[in-house]
């Protein structure tokens, strides 16, 4: 009798607890439960070989304790931030940054710890998707309901709740949630998004520039090709499109019209053209900063830039300066620029540094204290013995052929000898008394001269006669 009363008391307590908490599992004898439900299949048993897939209450308790501690720390940090904001000052800016960093670290730890709880819940025995068959579950639920003194309607409600829970755990959203947290995808996604945002904040111009243009990469043969435009009839190549259009005139009258020689017409203004992204070019050389696979990629703007960059950086320097013989270039334009100042007297500083331009020398002198422009070298000392001073003797160009043929007047008799130094050879008196009509010219110009000067000149002429 005492045993029956004890059993009835346990049933009443179980019924009260069940009504208060739907998740409460009623106390029953183990043999009664095992006898009412069929034995579960082998694949439904908890895993024994894989330890981390079993539910560990100790691990979950430690994680929950850790989460509670971090939540308390987050609350303290937020309270301190609120207090500092009330008494804000300019000196508290570094402290505010440190507090923000601490808060970010705490939140990341909370997220990672909460993610570690989800796999253990999924693989536990009471949340596992490998649930008993519906018949066994229904039998066990009915037995528990009868043992607790519940009616058949409450048993059907419990069965319906369990089916809803199973359906919720079998939904695709539930699987995706566990997959993301188990594989660490959520943390990687958060970290990756934060890294992209940080790169965009650090270099917003580069991030915006990458979206504006498309990158094209030419091959080495295309870059080093001497011609880029070719005739479709004879196959002759040209460097410029204008040269090709002029060449096409020789292939027929249809290429001589103004429309054929003009540039391609632009699209009409009325039609809306789809926005075309700007083109940028990449260097085909692997490891180059101008290659699109480089971390610090810097694109090239035009095809000419690609050609010059590739020749200067990755090709042999074949063009040699003919003046100094030391400088070598791979681009002909660079050689021509060098030849403009090669061989000229360079501006020298007292420190030994030479410059091609005077303004660069003075900028160097102004930058470094104690430096000064170097003085020109002194003239060579005079030679010992008697120095002979040679008179400069005139040389006259003979002929107009442009050659170096000169008429040497030193060999002519009477030139260079005597006190006159050859002046008498070219004097007007050597031609004799010949009148070329200068007298008449003087008479005609007498009105332009003063009367005294003209009279004196006329008397001198008469006296000479």
UniProtKB/Swiss-Prot annotation:
Pfam families registered for this protein in UniProt: zf-C2H2_STOP2_3rd, zf-C2H2_STOP2_C
Keyword Metal-binding annotated: yes
Localization in the cell: Nucleus
Record's compositionally biased regions (Pro residues): 374-383
Residue ranges, compositional bias (Low complexity): 136-148
Known role: Transcriptional activator that regulates the expression of genes involved in aluminum (Al) tolerance. Binds to the promoter of STAR1 and regulates transcript expression of STAR1 STAR2 and ART1 required for Al tolerance.
Reported phenotype of the disruption mutant: No visible phenotype under normal growth condition, but strong inhibition of root elongation when grown in the presence of Al or on acidic soil.
UniProt name for this protein: Zinc finger protein STAR3
Organism from which the protein derives: Oryza sativa subsp. japonica
Keywords (A to Z) from UniProt: Activator, Metal-binding, Nucleus, Repeat, Transcription, Transcription regulation, Zinc, Zinc-finger
One of the protein's GO biological processes: response to acidic pH
Chain positions of all zinc fingers (C2H2-type): 229-251, 281-314, 319-342, 347-371
Motif (Nuclear localization signal): 386-390
UniProt note on tissues of expression: Expressed in roots.
Chain residue ranges for the region called Disordered: 130-173, 254-284, 372-400
């Amino acid at each position: 009798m005492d045993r029956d009363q004890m059993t009835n008391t346990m049933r009443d307590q179980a019924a009260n607890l069940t009504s208060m908490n739907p998740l409460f599992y009623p106390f029953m004898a183990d043999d009664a439960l095992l006898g009412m439900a069929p034995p579960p299949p082998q694949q439904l048993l908890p895993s024994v070989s894989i330890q981390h897939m079993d539910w560990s209450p100790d691990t979950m308790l430690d994680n929950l304790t850790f989460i509670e501690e971090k939540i308390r720390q987050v609350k303290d940090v937020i309270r301190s931030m609120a207090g500092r904001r009330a008494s804000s000052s300019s000196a508290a800016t570094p402290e505010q940054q440190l507090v923000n960093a601490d808060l970010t670290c705490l939140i990341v730890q909370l997220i990672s710890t909460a993610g570690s709880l989800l796999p253990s819940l999924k693989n536990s025995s009471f949340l596992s998707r490998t649930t008993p068959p519906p018949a066994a579950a229904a039998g066990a639920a009915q037995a528990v309901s009868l043992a607790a003194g519940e009616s058949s309607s409450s048993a059907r409600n419990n069965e319906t709740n369990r089916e809803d829970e199973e359906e919720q755990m079998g939904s695709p959203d539930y699987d995706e949630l566990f997959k993301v947290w188990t594989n660490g995808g959520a943390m990687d996604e958060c970290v990756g998004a934060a890294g992209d945002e940080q790169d965009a904040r650090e270099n917003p111009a580069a991030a915006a520039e990458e979206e504006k243009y498309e990158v094209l990469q030419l091959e080495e043969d295309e870059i080093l090709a001497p011609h880029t435009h070719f005739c479709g009839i004879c196959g002759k190549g040209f460097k410029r499109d204008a040269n090709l259009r002029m060449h096409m005139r020789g292939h027929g009258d249809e290429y001589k019209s103004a429309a054929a020689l003009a540039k391609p017409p632009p699209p009409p203004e009325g039609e809306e053209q789809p926005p075309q992204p700007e083109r940028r070019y990449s260097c085909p050389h692997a490891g180059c900063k101008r290659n699109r696979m480089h971390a610090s990629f810097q694109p090239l703007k035009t095809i000419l830039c690609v050609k010059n960059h590739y020749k200067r950086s990755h090709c042999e320097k074949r063009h040699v300066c003919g003046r100094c013989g030391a400088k070598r270039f791979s681009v002909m334009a660079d050689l021509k620029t060098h030849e403009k100042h090669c061989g000229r007297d360079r501006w020298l500083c007292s420190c030994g540094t030479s410059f091609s331009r005077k303004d660069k020398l003075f900028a160097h002198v102004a930058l470094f204290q104690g430096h000064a422009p170097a003085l020109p070298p002194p003239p060579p000392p005079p030679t010992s013995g008697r120095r002979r001073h040679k008179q400069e003797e005139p040389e006259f160009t003979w002929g107009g052929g442009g050659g170096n043929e000169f008429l040497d007047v030193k060999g002519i008799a009477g030139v260079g000898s005597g006190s006159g130094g050859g002046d008498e050879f070219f004097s007007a008196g050597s031609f004799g008394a010949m009148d070329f009509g200068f007298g008449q010219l003087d008479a005609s110009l007498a009105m332009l001269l003063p009367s005294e000067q003209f009279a004196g000149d006329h008397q001198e002429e008469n006296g000479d006669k």
